[in-house]
Amino acid sequence: MVKTNKQDILKGILLGLVTLSVLTSVYYLNTSSTTQESEADNDYLKSEICYYALQGIKSDYHYHLQLNITIDGERIEIPTNIGFERDENGDTLFLHPIHTYDNSGRVHVETTRNATAELGFFFDIWGEEFSEENILDYNTGTEYVIEMFINNEPVDTFENTILEPYIFIDINYKIKN
């Protein structure tokens, strides 16, 4: 009779451990898939640099570049505080890893080691369009062209341009020659 009670207790403990293991596994599987689904809603959130910033971890690299946009010969002002998310009181809730502090065109990039930041990420954060056919609210159509230069050298990488320290990016929207 005593032996049966010990066996029942051992069976109960074993069954409890198996149940706990199964429930823990189900919880973690559901939690990780929910996180992946919410991140899939925004391509930028898939990038390593934004994930790093969302975790509140300091960056490994902090560098600057200059971005100049010209539309029909007129320089466009790049707004102050692109990349700052604020609450209703104006307090900063979050700072994206690619951001501005003023309207000079100086872009700050704060990344992890081995992260790749692209110019398209900056435009996504800004909430503006940029590609070979579009810049801000301007479309090339048949009469216009977008030319892009890095350090005065023509490039055709547009939104896929990799941001590097101390480069000068000039984007010109103009009538085709």
What do the predicted segments below correspond to?
Residues V2-N177:
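Ubiquitin-like/PB1-type beta-grasp interaction modules and other compact soluble beta-rich domains
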